Amino acid sequence: MRILIIGATGLIGTPVARALEANHEVLRASLNGSALQVDLADPESIRNLYTKVGQVDAVVSVAGQTVSRPLSALSDADFDLGLKSKLMGQINLVRLGIESLKDGGSFTLTSGQLSRRPIPGAVAVSVTNAGVEAFAHAASLELPRGLRINAVAPGRVSETLLALKMDPALGTPAVEVAQTYVKAVEGAMTGQTLDVVKSSS
């Protein structure tokens, strides 16, 4: 398959690209640091990306910005960032990419388990993630030509915990998170949210 990955240079996007390129042609795109550049907050940037890459079999989004702050400190701008970048950015990635996807192709979006397992200080993130999941479920009922759409919901990532000086064993290594994206791309499911489950080993 020919697969376009958005956010391919990020903490999760990098291992996702590596895992998929073992058996597929991978096109890497990101805001910075890759040959193909795209800003999810800018619909015109998304249009330009699809014009450059042409037809693909799958689009994987591992991108989008959000803000984590206590509810009392959140501003309209904080909510707007996540809604414009992570939510509407991924919605537009689908809306503007339908014609670029081959018959039977797939969109894989990124939400997060905070949508259903909230924690203090992450209200804006939870709202954005829930929107991504709702969109994937609803859009699956309307996509033409056998196109599929799913959302992957990572939880705590070991490398992020380590950077925060927390126990990385409480999270899932990014290379393991990547396997859920591979499952979404290579599988047959649609309209699903795939939770990244921490390995018991």
Describe each model-derived feature in a short phrase.
Residues 40-56:
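Conserved Rossmann-fold cofactor-binding substructure of NAD(P)-dependent oxidoreductases
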Residues 82-83, 91-92, 106-132, 136-143, ...:
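Catalytic loop of short-chain dehydrogenase/reductase
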Residues 60-69:
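Conserved NAD(P)H cofactor-binding loop of Rossmann-fold oxidoreductase domains
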Residues 70-71, 78-80:
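Substrate-binding pocket helix/loop in short-chain dehydrogenase/reductase
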